[in-house]
Regions:
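C-terminal motif of bacterial Sec signal peptides marking the signal peptidase cleavage site
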Residues: 15-18
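Mid-length scaffold segments of soluble, non-membrane domains
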Residues: 77-78, 87-88, 94-121
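Bacterial N-terminal signal peptides that target proteins for export
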Residues: 1-8
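Post-signal-peptide N-terminal segment of Sec-exported extracytoplasmic proteins
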Residues: 38-87, 91
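Amphipathic, charged alpha-helical segments and their helix-to-coil junctions
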Residues: 136-181
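Short, low-complexity, disordered segments immediately C-terminal to signal peptides
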Residues: 20-42
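Immediate flanking context of iron-sulfur cluster ligation sites
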Residues: 125-140
């Protein structure tokens, strides 16, 4: 019996000692390393092309700002640039399907909808700039993978690919289909 008492006492003492927190509480801050990847923000290349029409120049400037916002996956910036461009173009003499396509982009409520609408905006802008370039050139670029491999085009001031249809996903994938001079 005495032996069982010693056994229970030893077991209890062992449990108490093993559950004791031996860590020393110091106020040493814990260092946490966070791996972040900086998102590349694309800035539009300067426009070196000159147009034979002020209205086309105004329209292209707005187009380029919208494209840059889509490259950067910036929904609110794309919406704001589309609305501003629409307001400006409605006060000009420009009569084009571009304004109608731009109006559809301006009312989209998400970035994917804006990107889909941008395809029609690009088609209309291409119609506007062809034959209206006085000096310089634009690059007519293509992504075969856009919209479930249907493909889509866009215009750029620079030969380097910065695709508006995927944002930072596959940003530099695509090709220059032709120059527009």
């Amino acid at each position: 019996m005495k032996r069982n008492s010693y056994l229970v006492l030893a077991l209890g003492l062992f449990l108490v000692m093993s559950c004791k927190n031996n860590s020393k509480d110091t106020d040493t801050p814990e260092t946490v390393t966070v791996n972040t990847t900086a998102k590349e923000i694309h800035k539009a290349a300067p426009t070196t092309v000159e147009f034979s029409s002020d209205e086309v120049a105004i329209a292209y400037s707005g187009y380029n700002a919208i494209k840059t916002a889509l490259v950067n996956t910036n929904f609110s910036e794309a919406k704001s640039k589309a609305e501003t461009s629409l307001d400006t173009l409605r006060r000009t003499e420009l009569k084009s399907g571009y304004i109608d396509a731009l109006a559809l982009l301006a009312v989209e409520d998400n970035i994917d909808g804006q990107r889909e609408a941008f395809e029609a905006v690009t088609q209309e802008m291409t119609n506007l700039v062809e034959g209206n370039i006085a000096t310089g050139k634009l690059y007519y670029q293509y992504c075969p993978m856009a919209f479930n491999n249907k493909g889509a085009y866009w215009l750029s001031n620079e030969e380097a690919i910065r695709k508006p249809y995927f944002g930072d996903k596959m940003l530099k994938c695509g090709l220059v289909e032709r120059d527009i001079e």
